[in-house]
C-alpha cells in the first residue's frame, strides 16, 4: 500500500496504518514528500508489529544513522527504494542480518505480463509491481494471482479507502452462508 506523505489528522493516519496491518497488508510505502519520511516511518513503526515499512526516495540519498535508528525502531522491517533519474523503476534495499538482507525493484506496470524476466525467483530479490486499485473483489483476486504467478513479491496500490475493504474481505460478495431464514 502506498500511503500519502501528507497528513491531515495524525490520529486518523495512524489508525489507517494499524487497520491496514490488521487487514493483512504486507508492506506500507511512503514517498519522501513534504514531511520527513524517517519521522513518519518511526511513528508507523511505533504503532505496528508485523508490516514492513518502506520509503520511496526520489532524491537517492538517505542518512545511514537515521536508517539504522529506524531499523532498530521497526525491528528490522524497513525497506528503502531509490529511483534513478529518468528510470521507470525503483531499486529496493532491505537492511538486516545477512540472511534477511535483500535487494529488488519496484516496477510501474499495466499488467503482470510486463514483469517478464525482471521477476527473478531468487530469495534475495524482491519485485514489487505498482498498480492501480482493482475495481472489485474479482479483479483484486485476479490481479493478486497474476502478479504472484509472474513472480512478483507483491503489488503496491495507491491509498484508497476501498483497498482496506478488499484486504479485509477478498472473497466475492456471495455470502450465502449468512442467509437467515424467517418464518
Which residue stretches match the model-derived regions?
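N-terminal glycine-rich cofactor-binding segment that shapes the pocket for flavin-like pterin cofactors
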Residues: 1-146, 150-154, 158-183
